[in-house]
Amino acid sequence: SPPVCGNKILEQGEDCDCGSPANCQDRCCNAATCKLTPGSQCNYGECCDQCRFKKAGTVCRIARGDWNDDYCTGKSSDCPWNH
């Protein structure tokens, strides 16, 4: 079935889905189009801060055991596994 903008479920073709325009609390997401607002790079993720990717080298996951710290790439909102 085609994606439904406004159902709070991120579906194919949508950048974001924060619900209806009346209920959306996400300034990074255009609730009417389910696309990021102008100037926004992201709306969630360990490497997203105020609609922008965190700088490359920002720690996003602290080392545990034999694993090293994980760092943001500056190009994605996801925190990659760097070990």
Curated annotation (Swiss-Prot):
One of its GO terms (cellular component) is plasma membrane. Inhibits fibrinogen interaction with platelets. Acts by binding to alpha-IIb/beta-3 (ITGA2B/ITGB3) on the platelet surface and inhibits aggregation induced by ADP, thrombin, platelet-activating factor and collagen. Residues 2-83 form the Disintegrin domain. Disulfide bonds join 5-24, 5-34, 16-29, 16-34, 18-24, 18-29, 28-51, 42-48, 47-72, 60-79. Signal peptide: none annotated. Belongs to the venom metalloproteinase (M12B) family. P-II subfamily. P-IIa sub-subfamily. Transmembrane segments: none annotated. The lineage of its organism: Eukaryota, Metazoa, Chordata, Craniata, Vertebrata. It holds the Pfam family Disintegrin. Monomer. It is found in: Secreted. Keywords: Cell adhesion impairing toxin, Disulfide bond, Hemostasis impairing toxin, Platelet aggregation inhibiting toxin, Secreted, Toxin. PANTHER family: ADAM A DISINTEGRIN AND METALLOPROTEASE DOMAIN, DISINTEGRIN AND METALLOPROTEINASE DOMAIN-CONTAINING PROTEIN 28. The disintegrin belongs to the long disintegrin subfamily. This is Disintegrin bitistatin. Exists in 3 forms in the venom. The forms A, B, and C are present at 53%, 32% and 15%. The forms A and B differ by their disulfide bond pattern in the N-terminal part. No information is known about form C. It comes from the Eukaryota. A motif (Cell attachment site) lies at residues 64-66. One of its GO terms (molecular function) is toxin activity. Expressed by the venom gland.
